[in-house]
C-alpha cells in the first residue's frame, strides 16, 4: 500500500510517500520559522496561508522524488489534530479533495500518534510494549504503549509543556524563536553550577510534570542579574545550562519511575524536544543502568513531518480503518480515544 502523508498541524508543511513494502520513498518539508520569527511565535493566520501556498508544490516534489504518479497512490493520510484549526483544515481539505478526485480513501491521523510511531521508521524499531515520553511544544506525557491505539496515559504536565517552557524561557532572555534550539546552543557555552534550578515534582510520588515554576525561577534569576547590571551573554548561557539541566533531569527521573512502575525496559522518546542531545544522553545513560533500550527518530523526524503521518496512516489503513470524505479536525484530541488495532 502506497500512502501519501500530509502534515499541517502548526508551522511546518510536510509531505511524504510511504510504501508498506518498500518503506519511506520520499519526504519533503517546508518550515515557516523565518516567517514567524519576527513575531516571536507562530501566527495562526499566517501559518494557514503559507500551508495553502506550499502544499501542492510539495506534493509534486515528493511524487517526482519517488518517481511516482498520482495513480500509484492507494490512500492519503493527513493530520486531523491536535493543532491549529486553520492549519489543520488546509491539510484536511487538500487530502479529502485529492481522495475524492483520485477515488481513494483518506484517513485523519492523530498528530502525537504520528510522533510516537516515528521511531519505527528507523532500522532498529522498538517492539511493543514500551513506555513513551511524548515531549514537544504542546505536550509532555508518559504513555504505556501495548500496540497501535493501545495507549494508557501514565502522567502528563499540569501546566506548561517542556517545549513550551524552553521557548518561553528563551524569549524572556531575548533569544530568537524557536527558543528550544537557542537554549540548547547557549547551554553548550554555560558554566555548570553557577545557577541551580528546582527539579519540579520529583520529590513526590507520581508521574505528573510541572514546568511553570521552573520557568518562573529562570525568569527571576535573569531579572535579578539584569538588576545587578549583569545581562552578559555568559550569564544568559549559564542560565540556559541550568534550565536545560533541570528539565532533562526532571524528565529522566520521571521516565525511570515510569519504567519501574510498568516493569518495562524499553523507552521511546518522541516529539520536538526528543532531538535535544542532552536529553538523549541522559536517557541513554539511565537505560544503560537499567539494562534497557531507548529509541528515538532521526533528528529531522523529531519535529513535525509528513513521514510520520504517512507511516501512522498506513498502519491504520492496512488494519481496515476507514472514514468518509467529510472534513473534520480537532484542536484538542486525546490519544487514548483512538481505536486500538
From Swiss-Prot:
<feature type="binding site">
    <location>
        <position position="115"/>
    </location>
    <ligand>
        <name>Fe cation</name>
    </ligand>
</feature>
<feature type="binding site">
    <location>
        <position position="111"/>
    </location>
    <ligand>
        <name>Fe cation</name>
    </ligand>
</feature>
<keyword id="KW-0808">Transferase</keyword>
<dbReference type="InterPro" id="IPR022450">
    <property type="entry name" value="TsaD"/>
</dbReference>
<keyword id="KW-0963">Cytoplasm</keyword>
<dbReference type="Pfam" id="PF00814">
    <property type="entry name" value="TsaD"/>
</dbReference>
<keyword id="KW-0479">Metal-binding</keyword>
<keyword id="KW-0408">Iron</keyword>
<feature type="binding site">
    <location>
        <position position="304"/>
    </location>
    <ligand>
        <name>Fe cation</name>
    </ligand>
</feature>
<dbReference type="GO" id="GO:0005506">
    <property type="term" value="F:iron ion binding"/>
</dbReference>
<feature type="binding site">
    <location>
        <position position="180"/>
    </location>
    <ligand>
        <name>substrate</name>
    </ligand>
</feature>
<comment type="similarity">
    <text>Belongs to the KAE1 / TsaD family.</text>
</comment>
<dbReference type="GO" id="GO:0061711">
    <property type="term" value="F:N(6)-L-threonylcarbamoyladenine synthase activity"/>
</dbReference>
<protein>
    <recommendedName>
        <fullName>tRNA N6-adenosine threonylcarbamoyltransferase</fullName>
        <ecNumber>2.3.1.234</ecNumber>
    </recommendedName>
</protein>
<dbReference type="GO" id="GO:0005737">
    <property type="term" value="C:cytoplasm"/>
</dbReference>
<comment type="function">
    <text>Required for the formation of a threonylcarbamoyl group on adenosine at position 37 (t(6)A37) in tRNAs that read codons beginning with adenine. Is involved in the transfer of the threonylcarbamoyl moiety of threonylcarbamoyl-AMP (TC-AMP) to the N6 group of A37, together with TsaE and TsaB. TsaD likely plays a direct catalytic role in this reaction.</text>
</comment>
<feature type="binding site">
    <location>
        <position position="167"/>
    </location>
    <ligand>
        <name>substrate</name>
    </ligand>
</feature>
<keyword id="KW-0819">tRNA processing</keyword>
<dbReference type="InterPro" id="IPR000905">
    <property type="entry name" value="Gcp-like_dom"/>
</dbReference>
<feature type="binding site">
    <location>
        <position position="276"/>
    </location>
    <ligand>
        <name>substrate</name>
    </ligand>
</feature>
<feature type="binding site">
    <location>
        <begin position="134"/>
        <end position="138"/>
    </location>
    <ligand>
        <name>substrate</name>
    </ligand>
</feature>
<dbReference type="GO" id="GO:0002949">
    <property type="term" value="P:tRNA threonylcarbamoyladenosine modification"/>
</dbReference>
<dbReference type="InterPro" id="IPR043129">
    <property type="entry name" value="ATPase_NBD"/>
</dbReference>
<keyword id="KW-0012">Acyltransferase</keyword>
<dbReference type="InterPro" id="IPR017861">
    <property type="entry name" value="KAE1/TsaD"/>
</dbReference>
